[in-house]
Amino acid sequence: MFRILYLFVLCGAVSASIFNFMHDQYQHQEPRHEVSFEQRVLESNCDKYLCPGTLECVARPQDCPCPYPSSQMRCVLPNGDPLCISKPTGDYNGKYDDPAKNWKVDAKDDNVRDCGWVKRAWEGRV
């Protein structure tokens, strides 16, 4: 009985020691001096429109790219506002990969969430 109790106490002490060691490893890292988002906006030399999600300088808000172009596509709502959505998953032979053309694709299938689906949803047809 005492052996089992001793084993539990020993295991607890070892795990606490390992936890403290790991905790100390993270405490002694040098702090990173990252420039804040606000600072990057203020230091921007953009004389046109500065996209809020990517800090790209473009002519108008409708030209803002999506923050994650490999997994998102930009759709333009009927009122002209841009909207980034996740690209449809599945085997679509890369037709959603080109940002210059993917917003034109409409699978005409309400199970495929592409820009055509967004337009139909905007119009209340979904």
UniProtKB/Swiss-Prot annotation:
Sorted UniProt keywords: Signal
One BP annotation, GO: ERAD pathway
Signal peptide: 1-16
Keyword Repeat applies: no
InterPro entries noted in UniProt: LCL2 (IPR034543)
Role: Probable component of the endoplasmic reticulum-associated degradation (ERAD) pathway.
PANTHER family linked to this entry: LONG CHRONOLOGICAL LIFESPAN PROTEIN 2 (PTHR38425:SF1)
Family: Belongs to the LCL2 family.
Protein name: Long chronological lifespan protein 2
Native species: Clavispora lusitaniae (strain ATCC 42720) (Yeast)
Gene assigned in the entry: LCL2
